[in-house]
């Protein structure tokens, strides 16, 4: 058994999730690959696997039960947070992980190939690239953990939205001023997240066109 299996299982249960042993094993394979590649490619500033478990895996898992169903785009996915973690836990969901950083996308493509994952692809491009917009089309859910600015994320997501799409932004503090700027066009539901062993404010913002 993986040394972090029980810790991940207990953490996911505290988040209200009932993940299968298979899903937990996949998540830990992903973390092991991230730790290994990180030594050479600097995919994440977090190097300690125990810290990674909390700040990457459990943090990403904390949004799982509040995400609407449907095809998902993860913008600025970096090393795959939260997009890859969602894809591993929800094999029925089609996911596209998008980032402009070649090293990070190479890591994700290799991991996808090694595990023969069928529901997720990784694309190296800029989110505003018109060819990418035309090729990928529209999504039901658009996630990001990467954007400092909520308004910037909404603008980046805009070309990928259909009328019912949900923008799911992971934030620390609630960006009250930016929500105020967007309220004429988007409804916003704020969900407080409680990540086990993480003593930081975390929130999920679900935005939808009015």
From Swiss-Prot:
Q: Which SUPFAM superfamilies match?
A: S-adenosyl-L-methionine-dependent methyltransferases (SSF53335)
Source species of the chain: Acinetobacter baumannii (strain ATCC 17978 / DSM 105126 / CIP 53.77 / LMG 1025 / NCDC KC755 / 5377)
Q: Where does S-adenosyl-L-methionine bind?
A: 76, 81, 127-128, 145
- Record-stated family: Belongs to the methyltransferase superfamily. RNA methyltransferase RsmG family.
Q: Its function?
A: Specifically methylates the N7 position of guanine in position 527 of 16S rRNA.
Show the GO MF annotations.
rRNA (guanine-N7-)-methyltransferase activity
This entry's Enzyme Commission designation comes to 2.1.1.170
Gene Ontology CC terms:
cytosol
Give the protein name, as stated in the record. Answer: Ribosomal RNA small subunit methyltransferase G
- Which keywords does this chain's UniProt record carry? Cytoplasm, Methyltransferase, rRNA processing, S-adenosyl-L-methionine, Transferase
**InterPro entries, sorted:** rRNA_ssu_MeTfrase_G, SAM-dependent_MTases_sf
Its ancestry begins with: Bacteria, Pseudomonadati, Pseudomonadota, Gammaproteobacteria, Moraxellales
Compartments (UniProt record): Cytoplasm
Q: Which reaction does it catalyse?
A: guanosine(527) in 16S rRNA + S-adenosyl-L-methionine = N(7)-methylguanosine(527) in 16S rRNA + S-adenosyl-L-homocysteine
Q: In which broad location class does this protein mainly occur, judging by the first location in its UniProt entry? A: cytoplasm
